[in-house]
Amino acid sequence: MRTTRYCKCHFFNGESDHWGILDRTAFAQKGAKANFAPDTPILPKHLLLELNFDWEEEKVWGSTTYELLVYSNGVQEIKMDAANLEIDQVQVGSKRVSFENTGEKVIVFLPKPLKAGTAIKVKLNHSVSKPAAGIYFTKPDKEYPNRFKTVWTQGQDEDSKYYFPCFDQPNFKQTTEVKLHLPKGMFGLSNGRLLKKTSSASKSFYHYKLEIPYSTYLLSIVAGEFVEHKSKVGDIDIKWYVQKGREKEGRNSFKDTGKIMQFFSKYTGYAYPYKHYTQIAVPEFVFGGMENFTVTTQTDLTLHDDRARLDLDSNGLVAHEAAHMWFGDIVTAKDWSHAWLHESFATYFDALYTRESKGEEEFRYQLLEDAETYFSEDNRY
């Protein structure tokens, strides 16, 4: 994710107001507690998430089905993250089972203790109205009659639990399928490839699947009326989506995406592992950019018309989020105490693409700017 620039591990000869803080060991506030990855007696292998949406009530409801593998003997319960969700029913296999909903966790009680190596399937029916985080609705209203109607998610750090029960820590990875039931004519997007799309007199339906395991916070859902642009660079389909009428701005902002992906594949020696890379520019996306695996969400503020493009481009944001496909998505920190590595690598690779596209002087100037930005953090605490 990117809202501002982050640290890169480069230092420079010369004067700076901030060199005196190099002995600082952390920016942690007094009283901060140690953060550790959770125990893993059960690990998710596959997630099937099926959702419906009501814009008037700002309600999300549906079902979550997990295929799980037991890693410890004697497991009697499954604990999942579920913040302020209504849980209506839980099944293990075909049998309904009892559960406890604490408001932060849902604890599923198994019919009998399980042995290591056992595979089980758990399905939960759930709903939430006006979720506090994780998923956001926008729609026209009296004050803003032309406001864009959409819904979008933002999972980082641990906000997916606000709209479906899940294993909401970065060390848990699973393959996914996402099924979206939407109003007629509305476009739906999620991670991976589109398996099925149907439309009826009143509904649209989209079914996506991603076969590469990834962390829950990288799961994405966006729905609204968007226009697609598609091209091919090497073996990768490059796609981006914008609101109708902003296609030219989309080209201005995202036209170098294919070059960026090729450069990172070559530089890392590890080719981007999926068939496509998608970006979608979303109104009111206050998080800047979010590197959801295979399908990055970008703020529509990064879309530039021809006049604005004379003075700036979006390659910094595009490169930063694309770099996260390697550093954050494919390789992921075990827990959030190491998430700074995601951002540091992505910020550095953004600068590397600056050197590739604009030369050494621009590269070094960007490093200096980033170092100054990093050290200025000390003034905020």
Predicted regions and their residues:
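Hydrophobic alpha-helical and helix-loop surface patches within well-folded domains
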Residues: 208, 239-381
